[in-house]
Amino acid sequence: MIDLKNISLNFILSTGRTGSTLLSSMLNMHPEILSVSEEPFAYNLYPKYKNVTNWTDDTIEQFCYDFYLFSEGKLEPQFGKKDDIVKLLKEHQSVLTGEYAIKLAYFAFFPNKDKSQVTTIVDKELKFHHFLNEVADFYPTSKFIILSRDPRDNVLIKIKRAIKKKRVPSTIFLAKTWNYEYTKLIQKTSTLNKNRCLKVKYEDLVEKPAEVLKTITTFLNLPYNDVMLHYDENIKEEVKRNETAIGDTVKQHLSLFHEGLTQKVNTSKVDIWKKELTEAQNNKIWTICKETSTQFGYNSDGCKTISYFKIRMFKDILRFYFDKIIIPNVYYSLPYGLKYAIKKIKYGKNLKNGTWATKDFYKTTLPSK
């Protein structure tokens, strides 16, 4: 049995396109670390199961149902299958609590990884700025790694991603998103014990990876291991090993947006804003993000604070407030029962008759066997 009492649960907090997948992949190479990505069941399932002590077979089945119901669509290719969770839960059925069940769910990820030495879970999340205080209360011993990236590079990478997906990018929308999410992270982590939080810059991670990884493992009370620097070799092996099992959409997604994971860590994507964004774009981004970005150690580097608002930007600004602030804040402030009902109405019909379908954008069904 897994020593669940001594398994620590920790989190990487960031916005998208910050190198968080790179950091998670590096950490996942460590024999004592299990690092998974962007499935926030630790937040979604805790309220319902926190006080459950009598774990019957029906309770286990319901837990698995809820796990899929709340899926964020990021299960493939990192997750195993439903039976993996069921097996883990039944092996520990006599000692289960809500927190233990959630920890065990992590062990169903990366089925090819040897987890015999795992003592530390590191969960990479992009939405915790909405409810970080609740998560910190749910797991009072958890630690938080806040990963940042220069907002100008972050916006540029997101612009490129939007173009690849044949969307029309908005510099204002993306800059305001970076600024809002990191402002919330600063505000909420400031209320926590400083020993629970560690700031890491993407630029430092790729420039001096060994040094940064040593800082992180020390923060997590773990020994440093050089194997973390060889993440690219492991990812190549995993993709090759699972070539027939991984869907075409996943392969395309990995090729488009995570191609760097199959390369050695390098600084080729640092300060690319200086060459690929216009002066006007850089000044807009810096004007919006200046106050927050300086708290993460970024400087103007020639950018100026300007008056940038134009009437034509109103639509993008309005969309930002609705998409990134109003709608999420309304949803996450709802009572748990109402959020659960919304998920059931929207996705519940896909989880009937043992098909365990999910809104996972990589695939349409997750077989029960």
Go through the PLM ranges and name each one.
Residues 109-230, 238-260:
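PAPS-dependent sulfotransferase catalytic domain
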Residues 21-32:
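A conserved segment at the C-terminal end of the G1
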Residues 1-11, 223-369:
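PAPS-dependent sulfotransferases, especially Golgi type II membrane carbohydrate sulfotransferases
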Residues 38-124, 128-129:
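PAPS-dependent sulfation machinery
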